[in-house]
Amino acid sequence: MTVRVRIAPSPTGPIHVGNVHTALFNWLFARHHGGKFILRFEDTDLERSRPEWEQVIFEDLKWLGIDWDEGPDIGGPYGPYRQTERLDLYRKYAQQLLESGHVYKCYCTKEEEDADRREAQAAGRPYQYKGRCRDLTPEQQAAFEAEGRKPVLRFRVPRGEVIRFNDLVRGPIEVPTDSIGDFIIMRANGMPLYNFAVVVDDVTMNITHVLRGEGHIPNTPVQILIYQALGFPVPEFGHLGHMTNPERGKLSKRKGEAAIRDYREQGYLPEAMLNFMSLLGWTPPGAESGREFLTKEELIREFDLSRVTKASSVFDRNKLNWMNGVYIRKKSLEEFAELALPFVVSAGLCTEEQARARWDWFKEVMAQVHERVETLAEIPQHVDIFLKDEIEMDEKAARKFLTEAVKPFFQRVSEGLRSVEWSVPAIEQLVRSIQEEMGLTPKESFQPIRVAITGRTASPGLFETIYLIGRERVLERMAPYC
């Protein structure tokens, strides 16, 4: 048997971190077993589904390194891969269930069902459809049709039975059918509801394993009933734990925590995200001794559902930042500079052409922050002093360090910088010799220069900073205090 798994996002917005986590585990499972990973779109929300969101989902999954074997963009033997292009299939199987007696036409009005819900709520019991249309005679159906009522199709849930399945993550689960009301599979307008459409999709795409979030556990017995009614084998199910923030709440869209695109734009590396997310709910071999860093190849080779926990996992941004910083530091300086460039350009510090025209210098600038940043988005705030003509001055620091007392020292340093060989050792020798001659401490001499040329009290090494800012800019920035 060839393992076939799928991920089925809705193209109504950027793909959520939780959906990406589910996609990752499905992808790892498929690749580990030499199987197929299928991407399809649940796009029946016609008002909100957009082609541009499909492109965003494609891009974000590819950015992470998650590829698919069949999908809307590349096709495959079991397409189409959008639900809106599969409506004839749903109608075909709905008709089959209608003819076999597993579903029936329901003419109940919204008002009738709302009244039933209020009654159930008042009685303190969960709502279940009462079965008002479960056994209508042909004459009763004809009368409703004559009134102009358009029927939905409801599944006839058998009574007094137990649905059993062995969850690949949680073990045996049993659900009595008496706890499941007769459910709608097709709306009056001919559009399928989720549980019916997903079964038809999985059946016709030969899906063998369904790995998804624990929120789908209540859907599983409903879907098993549909599989059985259609006469198809039931796939194996595994339900993954929820993902929460450290406060055990949902990841926040407002804080830029919910969409994978947010992390991409904030300067996280795809390999760091992939590694970090693989550890949410899965324990790799060797974790007991602190093993946390795994390559994509190691993840594929070692992924096993037996090491997946049913407990919810905590998306700890601090740990992600730390892990991303480690991955950044593993990059060569050339690689780091290439990764940094788009963030520097988007911050308006320079154009790509300007950076590439002085690429060796640009790399030297990036070397000053290579060991300091945890995300690529942090880079501009550290390197703006090298790239901007004007700097923002910390007024408190200026009042403290740029006093009348520094003028003689600044005058001598500026004079020396005009003619000194422009190298870090020569600059350092010049400044230190003047400092020593004038009997100044490093704090009395170095910190004023740093504040004057960077506008702040913290920067990379002072002499490297002077060298990289450049002779002309350094002299311009020191001039007001000479």
From Swiss-Prot:
- Domain of life, source organism: Bacteria
Which positions bind Zn(2+)? Answer: 106, 108, 133, 135
Q: What subcellular locations does the record give?
A: Cytoplasm
Q: What are its cofactors?
A: Zn(2+)
Where would you say this protein principally sits, based on its record? cytoplasm
Query: Which InterPro entries does the UniProt entry name for this protein?
Result: aa-tRNA-synth_I_cd-bd, aa-tRNA-synth_I_codon-bd_sub2, aa-tRNA-synth_I_CS, aa_tRNA-synth_I_cd-bd_sf, Glu-tRNA-ligase_bac/mito, Glu-tRNA-synth_I_codon-bd_sub1, Glu/Gln-tRNA-synth, Glu/Gln-tRNA-synth_Ib_cat-dom
- One Pfam short name: tRNA-synt_1c
Please tell me which stretches of this chain the record labels as motif 'HIGH' region.
9-19
Q: Which residues are noted in the entry as ATP-binding?
A: 253
Tell me the GO BP annotations in alphabetical order: glutamyl-tRNA aminoacylation
Does the keyword section mention Manganese? no
Entry keywords, A to Z: Aminoacyl-tRNA synthetase, ATP-binding, Cytoplasm, Ligase, Metal-binding, Nucleotide-binding, Protein biosynthesis, Zinc
Xref: SUPFAM superfamilies: An anticodon-binding domain of class I aminoacyl-tRNA synthetases (SSF48163), Nucleotidylyl transferase (SSF52374)
GO terms under cellular component: cytosol
Looking up Gene3D superfamilies in the UniProt record yields: 1.10.10.350, Glutamate-tRNA synthetase, class I, anticodon-binding domain 1, HUPs
Per the UniProt entry, the Enzyme Commission number(s) are 6.1.1.17
The cofactor binding remark recorded in the entry reads: Binds 1 zinc ion per subunit.
Molecular-function annotations in GO: ATP binding; glutamate-tRNA ligase activity; tRNA binding; zinc ion binding
Q: Which reaction does it catalyse?
A: tRNA(Glu) + L-glutamate + ATP = L-glutamyl-tRNA(Glu) + AMP + diphosphate
'KMSKS' region, short sequence motif: residues = 250-254
NCBIfam families with a match to the protein in the record: gltX_bact
Functional summary from the UniProt entry: Catalyzes the attachment of glutamate to tRNA(Glu) in a two-step reaction: glutamate is first activated by ATP to form Glu-AMP and then transferred to the acceptor end of tRNA(Glu).
| Assembly behavior | Monomer.
Family membership, please give it: Belongs to the class-I aminoacyl-tRNA synthetase family. Glutamate--tRNA ligase type 1 subfamily.
* Name the record gives this protein: Glutamate--tRNA ligase
**Source organism of the structure:** Symbiobacterium thermophilum (strain DSM 24528 / JCM 14929 / IAM 14863 / T)
